[in-house]
Amino acid sequence: EITLGLSHLIHKVLNPRAPFEFTLERIKNCAWANLPLSMAVALLFKKRFDPRGPMDDATFDAECAKLTSEIDRTASSETSRTVLLTMLDAVRHVLRTNYHVHGRFGFAVRLDPKFLRNDDRPALPYGVFFVHGRGFDGFHVRFQDIARGGLRVVMPRSEAQHGREAERLYDEVYGLAFAQQLKNKDIPEGGAKAAILLEPGAGIDRCVKAFVNSLLDLITPEPETRNQIVDLSGLDELIYLGPDENITPDHIEWVVRRAALRGYPLPTAFMSSKPGAGINHKVYGVTSEGVNVFLDVALNAVGIDPRKQPFTVKITGGPDGDVAGNMIRILDRDYGGNAKVV
């Protein structure tokens, strides 16, 4: 399980460097073809975070050096060598894991964000969580300690589509979280985002619950869970989620109930847009209303009165998305036939 989870994680590091060399299948094949080495990495991970007696830094560094030498000497190919060394580097950057938590629903790690940094991801997030479970992978990224952002579920219909989505999963979460960080420049909360990528046919309810439970494993201060986790970060962390694509009111209510059951200190704040509390941003189209204000000003600035003259609009997204779907409705409400979506 550790080897498989790390394989899915390092895919997000290696694939941007060489998409054809480092497909997910090739990464997993390299791990299986060098099983003694990949198992040694997994065993090191297991010992490092064993709550009964975690490996100290000096011993860990010595074991990493020894294993690096072994990989350099015996890996079956240069591609395999890169895969195994990156897997070992991933272990170095793990700050917390739920691997030893009894009754867990997925394999989760809290990462040092430097592990996923590259030239296309120059801004360093405050925190990154990765969860691998049966039928899904998921990330949560935030750019400040206190940050809010939506949780979305990506549901590909085919293996080919899933492969494309897997390649861009972290970049999508990173990009959306960073955009939210910029949008939130004038308020105390920073930007965050979470996304769960489902394999075709995987059940959305089970995967959402497994992802959320795995996050709670790593952040709840509940003593029984905390005693099963070795924390190298020294941080008490709070996460604030909001509903995004494919998250239903039933999911929202379950998430809040589960957070309370797991001893999370602020369960009602763990997920926003709860039925019966506050306003439903989706129903009122809050974000889309703001976009429409900017659109109206921009059109008038270039000499187009949108209430009297026709204009065309290109929307990146779709009617199934919260912002785009509400935007189409608002365009029709305010501008009628003058607004032509292309």
Q: What residues fall within each predicted segment?
A:
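An acidic- and aromatic-residue-enriched active-site/binding cleft used to recognize and process polar
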Residues: D244, G318-D320
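Glycine/serine-rich phosphate-binding loop and adjoining beta1-alpha1 elements at the start
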Residues: F136-G138, A160, E165, V173-F311, ...
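Domain-scale recognition of functional cores that engage charged ligands
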Residues: T3, G285-V293, G321-G325
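Dinucleotide-binding/catalytic capping subdomain of oxidoreductase cores
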Residues: G321, G325-V342
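Often metal-dependent polyanion-binding catalytic scaffolds in large enzymes
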Residues: E1-V128
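Function-dense linear segments that define catalytic or interfacial modules
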Residues: G133-G135, V141-E165
